[in-house]
């Protein structure tokens, strides 16, 4: 098992939406460094597959069926994690609805807007808030530290026409995360966001490049799309003591898209 600056032995990470996509990539990054993982997701078949994959790294993995838009289920989910693992060291709020169909905000009903925010903003807020509650309690008992991570997007920085609920959820949570960094810093708890660029759901080198992939070759400073494994390292970094003085930030993992003209 890996040791050293990024060693996560004895640490526990809660990852919402951790059974696929970026959430599973975050989980792999934790597991590769010896950390235990608690996956929160509602698809039990995918949960089982993710659990089997991660256990191959020789770590403890549990899965929990949690609807993060429900405060009651979120609190209960953490109770399950504490019973199974005894502690929570990092939380990755990754669960959220996919970007909705592009549509003018003039045509978007208030209910549709609010329904989206219930999961993608309120759900992420509840996930990080209740995780912070456990970390504060642990820190007050003398075991200082913890890491809160929100998975955002480049829409936190750039205008995104036709998807106001998606952009609003990401930008709103970015502000909340910065507030968490200020409020919980005295407990040694960090709070950061990750803003992925364009990411392919497959693994490196699989399949032909799509028209969008080819477009990203000229949009990114590193001329390729992102892949799932590109996000394993940032998870290990943010969960480990290597990031103990890094808080209130948004890490853009985008192949240099944001710096291109």
Residues of each region from the PLM?
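Short C-terminal tail/terminal secondary-structure segment
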Residues: 2-4, 102, 158, 218-219, ...
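Conserved glycine-rich cofactor-binding loop
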Residues: 12, 19-20
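Substrate-binding pocket helix/loop in short-chain dehydrogenase/reductase
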Residues: 102-105, 109-114, 216
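Active-site helix of classical SDR
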Residues: 128, 169, 177
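Residue(s) in the substrate-gating loop at a strand-loop-helix junction
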Residues: 153
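Short, small/polar-rich loop/turn modules that mediate ligand/substrate recognition or access, typified
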Residues: 185, 190, 246-248
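C-terminal helical subdomain
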Residues: 193, 214-246, 253-255
């Amino acid at each position: 098992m890996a040791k050293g600056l990024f060693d996560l032995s004895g640490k526990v990470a809660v990852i919402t939406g951790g059974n696929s996509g970026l959430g599973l990539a975050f989980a792999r990054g934790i597991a590769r460094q010896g950390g235990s993982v608690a996956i929160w997701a509602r698809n039990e078949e995918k949960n089982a597959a993710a659990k089997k994959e991660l256990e191959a790294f020789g770590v403890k993995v549990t899965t929990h069926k949690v609807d993060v838009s429900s405060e009651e289920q979120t609190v209960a989910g953490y109770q399950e994690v504490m019973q199974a693992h005894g502690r929570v060291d990092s939380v990755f709020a990754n669960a959220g609805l996919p970007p909705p169909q592009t549509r003018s905000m003039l045509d978007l009903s208030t209910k549709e807007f609010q329904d989206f925010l219930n999961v993608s903003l309120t759900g992420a807020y509840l996930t990080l808030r209740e995780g912070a509650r456990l970390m504060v309690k642990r820190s007050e008992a003398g075991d200082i530290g913890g890491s809160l991570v929100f998975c955002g997007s480049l829409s936190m920085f750039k205008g995104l026409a036709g998807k106001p609920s998606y952009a609003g959820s990401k930008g709103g949570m970015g502000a909340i995360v910065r507030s968490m960094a200020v409020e919980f810093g005295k407990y040694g708890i960090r709070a950061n966001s990750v803003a992925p660029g364009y990411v392919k759901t497959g693994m490196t080198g699989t399949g032909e490049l799509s028209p969008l992939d080819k477009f990203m070759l000229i949009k990114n400073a590193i001329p390729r799309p992102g892949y799932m494994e590109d996000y394993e390292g940032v998870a290990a970094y943010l969960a480990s003591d290597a990031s103990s003085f890094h808080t209130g930030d948004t890490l853009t993992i985008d192949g240099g898209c944001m710096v291109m003209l």
